[in-house]
Amino acid sequence: MPTESGSCSTARQAKQKRKSHSLSIRRTNSSEQERTGLPREMLEGQDSKLPSSVRSTLLELFGQIEREFENLYIENLELRREIDTLNERLAGEGQAIDGAELSKGQLKTKASHSTSQLSQKLKTTYKASTSKIVSSFKTTTSRAICQLVKEYIGHRDGIWDVSVTRTQPIVLGTASADHTALLWSIETGKCLVKYAGHVGSVNSIKFHPSEQLALTASGDQTAHIWRYVVQLPTPQPVADTSQQISGEDEIECSDKDEPDIDGDVSSDCPTVRVPLTSLKSHQGVVIAADWLVGGKQVVTASWDRTANLYDVETSELVHSLTGHDQELTHCCTHPTQRLVVTSSRDTTFRLWDFRDPSIHSVNVFQGHTDTVTSAVFTVGDNVVSGSDDRTVKVWDLKNMRSPIATIRTDSAINRINVCVGQKIIALPHDNRQVRLFDMSGVRLARLPRSSRQGHRRMVCCSAWSEDHPICNLFTCGFDRQAIGWNINIPALLQEK
């Protein structure tokens, strides 16, 4: 049609006009310019409308790009010569690689193995010279085995905390927003004891170091100490739900609903409704509680911005620890010394020292830029802190001015836990992932998560259990389930 032909003609004219006024820059190096003797303006293009300063800058940039390509080309030639030398050496030993000659842009398939070996050797040499820099976003080359063993399903709401008993028999404890705490058989996944003494969300659970006593903290502004008696059922063969995964080799799963719960699985197990002791001094939610070494005192952390130290036998308040500017999020005690660390939304964590009975000292640490979700002790002289600022930091108690290692991740971190023997940190994330790092900040593995296994909602807490032969790591989340894992980290991965 006339309209179409006219429009096409107009478009062609406009295109030719733009082309005639386009910048024409001929890139050349200094040697070519010296050989031709042409003036700079002729090399740049007579019809350029750009100012001379802009043209000069462009020429300089193009020159830099050209030099980079020249360097790459030279390196490529050197690599090819190395490969030729390697092939000649192999041929002299009777191990010549067929088709190892190089084409202009590629190598033959069978020569790629030699190239890979050479490339790996170069990478190893480079890494050895730069090993002082730790990047938490780089995975290691060895394989860590992370196997899902058991799922513990029975809570009616999200699970905030998970813990393992320190006395025989070894059982798993979970604290849930459904106002209950449950004890589980690790081997069978059966509920053994249900604690229903709280009238609010149960936010944490910790076990006495030598007796069958549990300590729970709740949104009802109290902490309870209660006794449990468990009788383990006969273990059944564990179904093989394993998926041996290393690093990042798992398949991401889509958002799915929480696991279906047929009936109340905790209705058949014995229920404890009355605590031995109820600690009631807080004016807000009690978010966490823990036993001091020896088990004669406990510490609680609350949204009223205080942490309280209680005597277990008398239930009396011994100390009220004040100083945080916002709500507390967690508390943890040292396994062998009278030390307490408290975490807060004020971006700090505080170290409280009760080793001297006459006075207690406090140190404030400001290493994070967002809520400190947890800070925990290791057996040695380290504290590990995790935060909503997506970092985990490792501190030395002898010099806590700055962290000795920093782990940067892609999601907020919740209640962390450190494996005593292997010194591995388990990081539960808001984004449903669980990652494992060593104390130097090197990532060891990420727990598998697919359409068939793993957490489907935020992971709230992690807990190691080195003494159990089947599961040595437990995680829980807001998908209303706890998961038992078997983690096998090769010794090679832990070598420094």
From Swiss-Prot:
Keywords: Cytoplasm, Nucleus, Repeat, WD repeat. It holds the Pfam family WD40. InterPro entries: G-protein_beta_WD-40_rep, WD40/YVTN_repeat-like_dom_sf, WD40_repeat_CS, WD40_repeat_dom_sf, WD40_rpt. SUPFAM superfamilies: WD40 repeat-like. Residues 1-13, 22-31 have a biased composition (Polar residues). Residues 32-47 have a biased composition (Basic and acidic residues). Disruption phenotype: Mice lacking WDR37 have reduced absolute numbers of circulating T and B lymphocytes. It is found in: Cytoplasm; Nucleus. WD repeats lie at residues 154-194, 197-236, 281-320, 323-362, 367-405, 408-447, 454-495. PROSITE patterns: WD_REPEATS_1, WD_REPEATS_2, WD_REPEATS_REGION. Forms homodimers. Interacts with PACS1. Interacts with PACS2. Required for normal ER Ca2+ handling in lymphocytes. Together with PACS1, it plays an essential role in stabilizing peripheral lymphocyte populations. This is WD repeat-containing protein 37. It comes from Mus musculus. The gene is Wdr37.
